[in-house]
Swiss-Prot record:
Keywords: Ribonucleoprotein, Ribosomal protein, RNA-binding, rRNA-binding. Belongs to the universal ribosomal protein uL10 family. SUPFAM superfamilies: Ribosomal protein L10-like. It comes from the Bacteria. GO terms for cellular component: large ribosomal subunit. PROSITE patterns: RIBOSOMAL_L10. GO terms for molecular function: large ribosomal subunit rRNA binding; structural constituent of ribosome. GO terms for biological process: translation. This is Large ribosomal subunit protein uL10. Part of the ribosomal stalk of the 50S ribosomal subunit. The N-terminus interacts with L11 and the large rRNA to form the base of the stalk. The C-terminus forms an elongated spine to which L12 dimers bind in a sequential fashion forming a multimeric L10(L12)X complex. Transmembrane segments: none annotated.
């Protein structure tokens, strides 16, 4: 990689760090190519990305971003996972690390908040933004449905009483 390519890569990685909701840094020593490809595909399917970058270039790319505090984590063979949704990257990385003990989570960042490995694992246990939205919609819809049932029930009862009264008058 020559200097121009490095500059271009750093600019691209800087943009990725600025746009991401969360960043996870992990050691990947000992992962096979197949395992790394599996991690990349799982992250891509979830809406994130995985990148192996030279530590020096990653530290330069972090400058000027909210995630600048995680620069110390870039030692050894590191991989960076990031996604726009703050929960996606930690969730996929932690699930993959459970199945593959060669992936060791070092820490990460969510916005300006620097996270250690336990913080990333805690973040991974939270529901995703889409799941939270679905729960919120469910909470809003349930009372509205109950209200509709309650308001329509008296009208139905009145109609039955009037119908019974009309049948009684016809019979008499």
């Amino acid at each position: 990689m020559d200097r121009a390519e490095k500059r271009e890569f750093v600019a691209w990685l800087n943009g990725a760090f600025k746009e991401s909701g969360s960043v996870v840094v992990a050691h990947y020593t000992g992962l096979t190519v197949a395992q790394m490809s599996d991690l990349r595909s799982k992250m891509r399917d979830a809406g994130g990305a995985v990148k192996v970058a030279k530590n020096r270039l990653a530290k330069i790319a972090l400058q000027g971003t909210e995630s600048e505090g995680i620069a110390d984590l870039f030692t050894g063979q590191t991989v960076v996972a990031y996604a726009n949704d703050p929960i996606t990257a930690p969730k996929v990385a932690v699930e993959f690390a459970k199945a593959n003990d060669k992936l060791v989570i070092l820490g990460g960042a969510m916005g300006a908040t620097t996270l250690n490995a336990d913080g990333v694992k805690s973040l991974a246990s939270l529901p995703s933004l889409d799941e939270l939205r679905a729960k919120l919609v469910g909470m809003i819809q349930t009372p509205a449905q109950r209200l509709a049932v309650l308001t329509s029930a008296p009208a139905g009862q009145i109609a039955r009483v009037i119908g019974a009264h009309a049948r009684k008058n016809e019979a008499a």
